[in-house]
Amino acid sequence: SAVEVGLVNVMSRETVLKRYLEGIKGNYDYVLLDCRPSLGMLVINALSASDYVLIPVQADYLAAEDMTELVGTVQSIRQQINPKLKIGGVFLTMANDTNFRRDIVAGVKENFGKYLPVMEAVIPSTVRLAEISTADKSIFRHEPNGRAARAYGTLVKEVEGIGEKQRIRPADIAR
């Protein structure tokens, strides 16, 4: 993308987004950075600027296997650039209601749940989700009572739970 090309010659290019967000993050409860599924410079910037990363995984065998590469990248970012970065959770997307997909979902929870928090939210594959990419509105406005909106609502509550845990300080617990 043009932004990634523009970052090539920038000093400390891995932390451009982090430096920008430092100036505005006090204005927000949460800042969510939604990135394309790649490991380019924009994703590296997002990881260097984040406290937590949520990992969406398509509910198929190969995508679940590829998740280990992203986990390795998160560990590298934590060691080299952002020691605060944690994996907030893994959630499954594009999950059709078939036995095969249910097996994938169960396998991800069983195999990765030992090492990573696997979120309860499972985002279904629906026509409505495909439609919103051209509708210029969220699934909550497009089909507020649909399966996808309910699943994303569950995900939002889980993300809020991560944020609430972060806000609790040891002094608050001791009281």
Indicate residue ranges for each PLM-predicted region.
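C-terminal lobe/tail of nucleotide-utilizing enzymes
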Residues: Q79-R175
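Conserved phosphate-coordination/catalytic loops
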Residues: M11-T15, T68, G146
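Conserved catalytic-core segment of NTP-binding enzymes
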Residues: E22-P124
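P-loop/Walker-type NTP enzyme "switch/lid" segment
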Residues: S1-G26, I81, S133-A135
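Short amphipathic alpha-helical segments at helix-loop
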Residues: A2-V5, L54-A59, F140
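Charged catalytic carboxylate motif
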Residues: V16, E69, A151-T154
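Generic structural "secondary-structure junction" signal
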Residues: V5, N9, M41, A63-A64, ...
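Residue-level signal for well-ordered alpha-helical scaffold segments within enzymatic catalytic domains
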Residues: R19-G23, N45, T154, E158
